[in-house]
Amino acid sequence: MKIIFVCTGNTCRSPMAESIAQSKLPNHTIVSRGMYAIDGQPISDHTKEILLERHLNVPYQAQSFTASDINADLILTMGSSHKRIIKELYDNTDHVFTLNEYVDKIGEVSDPFGGSKSAYLEIYNELNLLIDSLKNKILN
């Protein structure tokens, strides 16, 4: 199964989700993208530090969401605005959900961009729990 996590710039939330999910779902292809990413831009320093401290894979450069990405098995966005944009731009989007929606949780994953390391750590911990729920849903 190919899963794509999507956020705004692909420098904070979706790279964290990608790394966490790769560690929890090693038999699946997991990548991340940004709706407004600048291809090749480095991920945020706080994201990189948090992932390295936990010995997780670090996706070092941002990648934008492209037309070929719509062919993934599952597309999980960090917020409803990302989901809405994908659904407006592409056909056949029954496999596009917010991450929270897909695992039956209320809310969205907040953007820590520009915040302190502790703000990023909060998002990491939230994503870790959401991806535990994702793993349970996929494997059961």
UniProtKB/Swiss-Prot annotation:
Domain of life per record: Bacteria
InterPro entries referenced in this protein's UniProt entry, alphabetically: LMW_PTPase, Ptyr_pPase, Ptyr_pPase_sf, Tyr_phospatase_low_mol_wt
EC number: 3.1.3.48
Catalytic residues (positions): 7 (nucleophile), 13, 111 (proton donor)
SMART domains, A to Z: LMWPc (SM00226)
SUPFAM superfamilies per the UniProt record, alphabetical: Phosphotyrosine protein phosphatases I
Catalytic activity: O-phospho-L-tyrosyl-[protein] + H2O = L-tyrosyl-[protein] + phosphate
Molecular function in Gene Ontology: protein tyrosine phosphatase activity
Transmembrane segments: none
Cell inner membrane as UniProt keyword: no
Protein's UniProt keywords contain Hydrolase: yes
This protein's UniProt keywords: Hydrolase, Protein phosphatase
PANTHER family: LOW MOLECULAR WEIGHT PROTEIN TYROSINE PHOSPHATASE, LOW MOLECULAR WEIGHT PROTEIN-TYROSINE-PHOSPHATASE ETP-RELATED
Functional summary from the UniProt entry: Dephosphorylates the phosphotyrosine-containing proteins.
Assigned protein family: Belongs to the low molecular weight phosphotyrosine protein phosphatase family.
Protein name, entry field: Low molecular weight protein-tyrosine-phosphatase PtpB
Organism: Staphylococcus saprophyticus subsp. saprophyticus (strain ATCC 15305 / DSM 20229 / NCIMB 8711 / NCTC 7292 / S-41)
Gene: ptpB
